[in-house]
Regions:
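Non-transmembrane, aqueous-exposed alpha-helical and coiled segments at domain scale
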Residues: 219, 228, 234-268, 272-313, ...
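Active-site-facing alpha/beta catalytic cores
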Residues: 2-242, 285, 293, 309-324
Length: 324
């Protein structure tokens, strides 16, 4: 609930600031498999298989936890289904009432530095008051008290994704029902690979992570494989270059996409290209680098950012002082 609450708060601020609709997609209810850069992990002189996500093994650094267990797939499925049911109930049952979301934001800025936050909330307050005066409110307009919320994750664990794929009896098309939107990771985007082949065959909107090693000609080939009909909205290209590499690599890819007349959505993932390892061994991202990549992306163009309502170590402002 808290995760959805924060996402609704953020989307309201973005909608008000940009005067544009915001599509709300959460990496939730299914992200239980993790790509790893190495097959093993070392700690205190001991080497064990890498943690591959709760779909496969456990995070605890002990030999028993790192043994793959197929029963985890059933638990992951049950967890995903429960989460999706809750999201559906919250998003359609009044939790997303525009007035309530606005009150959450007002509570957020109450004890904080005013400035730009208060300016945005004043703008939203004026808009809501104007609509109320015109007789438009959540009580008589369902769209103001409900929200369309979509789920997403990387289509990494192919046996699981395949088991969740169904045929639409009216069209004969295949849909991966594990999420609304699935993507192909930067490590699994080989044109002749199984992940590209799987995503090519489903009708879900799909994403493709684009990193520094992706050549322009490879991108064109992948676009033609994944979206042969050049359908608008089918393919999202998710850049993850790192703060210092965006302006070096992204313009070249954008230019070749424009030249070929390909219809894609550009998105930015400023998290995974800025990963560093702190002295404690935790992977984290300096917030300054995250913000820099977002700014550089917009300087050339939606963006994706990991967020949490909990205290986390995945992103810090001063990573050098990270000690927990």
């Amino acid at each position: 609930r808290d995760t959805l609450k924060v996402l609704l708060q953020m989307s309201l601020v973005l909608t008000a600031s940009a005067s544009m609709p915001v599509v709300k997609i959460g990496r939730i209810a299914g992200q239980f498999s993790k790509p790893r850069s190495a097959p093993t992990e070392k700690k205190d002189g001991k080497e064990l298989p890498s943690y591959l996500g709760d779909n496969i093994n456990g995070m605890e650094f002990v030999e028993k936890a790192r043994i793959p267990d197929a029963k985890r797939l059933f638990r992951a499925y049950s967890q995903s289904a429960s989460t999706l049911n809750l999201l559906r109930a919250f998003s359609q049952g009044g939790f997303a009432d525009l007035r309530q979301v606005h009150l959450w934001n007002l509570g957020f800025i109450k004890d904080r530095t005013k400035g730009k936050y208060k300016e945005i909330e004043d703008k939203i307050s004026d808009a809501l008051a104007f609509m109320e005066a015109c007789g438009i409110n959540p009580d008589n307009n369902r769209k103001l008290r409900t929200v369309n919320f979509y789920t997403s994750h990387e289509a990494l664990h192919l046996p699981f994704e395949e088991s969740m794929t169904r045929i639409d009896s009216t069209t004969g098309e295949y849909h991966d029902t594990s999420a609304h939107f699935v993507w192909i990771g930067d490590r699994t985007r080989q044109p002749d690979g199984a992940h590209v082949e799987f995503c090519r065959g489903i009708k879900n909107p799909i994403g493709l992570k684009c990193g520094p090693t992706l050549k322009p000609e490879e991108l064109i080939n992948l676009c033609n494989i994944l979206n042969p009909e050049n359908e608008a909205g089918r393919l999202t290209l998710i850049s993850r270059f790192g703060a210092d590499n965006v302006q070096k690599y992204l313009p070249k890819l954008m230019q070749v996409i424009k030249k070929e007349g390909l219809k894609v959505i550009w998105s930015c993932d400023p998290m995974h290209g800025n990963t560093i390892k702190a002295a404690t061994g935790f992977k984290t991202r300096p917030f300054e680098s995250v913000l820099k990549e977002v700014k550089n992306f917009f300087a050339d163009l939606c963006f994706c950012i990991l967020k949490s309502v909990q205290q986390i170590s995945a992103c810090v402002s001063q990573w050098q002082s990270h000690s927990h």
